């Protein structure tokens, strides 16, 4: 299991938080995703044998947010 914190721009409300967390947890291999609106990031616990950083970044960007 691995943990990464991904910087995300454009999140400002609970809808944003829910959209990003849901997009990530729907990926096979992601166990948890915890968005911090204040910090502008999401902490993700995942199995790096099943999911990659580019896949997670794509899932976030598909929701309309920018990944740094």
From Swiss-Prot:
Gene: copZ
InterPro entries, sorted: CopZ, Heavy-metal-associated_CS, HMA_Cu_ion-bd, HMA_dom, HMA_dom_sf, MerP/CopZ
Keywords, ordered alphabetically: Chaperone, Copper, Cytoplasm, Metal-binding
Main location: cytoplasm
Residues bound to Cu cation: 13, 16
Free-text function comment from the UniProt entry: Chaperone that serves for the intracellular sequestration and transport of Cu(+). Delivers Cu(+) to the copper-exporting P-type ATPase A (CopA).
Gene Ontology molecular function terms on file: copper ion binding
Transmembrane feature ranges: none
GO terms for cellular component: cytoplasm
Cystines in this chain: none
Protein name, as recorded: Copper chaperone CopZ
PANTHER family cross-referenced by the UniProt entry: P-TYPE CATION-TRANSPORTING ATPASE
Domain of life: Bacteria
Subcellular location: Cytoplasm
HMA domain residues: 2-68
């Amino acid at each position: 299991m691995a943990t990464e914190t991904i910087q995300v721009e454009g999140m400002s409300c609970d809808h944003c938080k829910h959209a990003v967390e849901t997009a990530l947890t729907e990926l096979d291999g992601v166990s948890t995703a915890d968005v911090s609106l204040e910090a502008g990031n999401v902490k993700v616990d995942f199995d790096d044998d099943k999911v990659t950083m580019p896949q997670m970044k794509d899932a976030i960007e598909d929701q309309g947010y920018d990944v740094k």
